[in-house]
Amino acid sequence: MHSHNKKVLIAGYTGFIGSHLIKEMKADNSITIIPLSRSNGFDLAGDPKIFDIECDVIVNLAGVVGIDRSWKEPKDFYKDNYLTTLNLLELARKNSASIVHISSYVYGVPQYLPVDEKHPIQGYNPYASSKILSEELCKDYGRYYDIPVTILRPFNVYGTNQSSQNLYKV
């Protein structure tokens, strides 16, 4: 019986969540990790080399972040977050791979508490809107191309090595 190493592409592995995820996954010998990020020379929104990669699972943690910055550079947010997701979905389609899309900040101002998955989504800034558009793209690819898609929306993630830029003073 042959064992098959799962090839897991982690896009955005240098970010807060990605750096922790890759550390945990390295402990599993049945997984081959394919780390992609701007820091290792990949422009996930436009580099055609991405389509040469073979993988079984894609974890999309890539993207530009920051609400204030999104108002100053909205084009970058829409381009990077949406096109990165589109390219990763195309890669998933090419490889018959599943994709885990990590999203955030899509609920806007809470209409009720606690906020649950049925809460309406609202893009009150370019960052949130780019995340909502990316989620919709994932749903479309899941429906039309039968790609297994999981969308996760972590909230208030914190821990070791977190950037102080994302912390709030109490």
PLM region spans:
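N-terminal Rossmann NAD(P)H-binding glycine-rich loop of SDR-like oxidoreductase domains
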Residues: 8-26
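SDR active-site strand-loop-helix element
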Residues: 11, 36, 58-62, 99-104, ...
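Adenosine-cofactor binding site in Rossmann-like domains, unifying the SAM/SAH pocket
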Residues: 33-49
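NAD(P)H-binding glycine-rich loop region in Rossmannoid oxidoreductase-like domains
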Residues: 48-80, 91
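Conserved catalytic-core motifs of eukaryotic protein kinase domains, centered on the activation segment
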Residues: 68-76, 109-114, 163-164
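Conserved Rossmann-fold NAD(P)-dependent oxidoreductase catalytic core, especially the SDR/UDP-sugar
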Residues: 86-126, 150
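NAD(P)-dependent short-chain dehydrogenase/reductase
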Residues: 113-114, 136-170
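Active-site helix of classical SDR
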Residues: 126-133
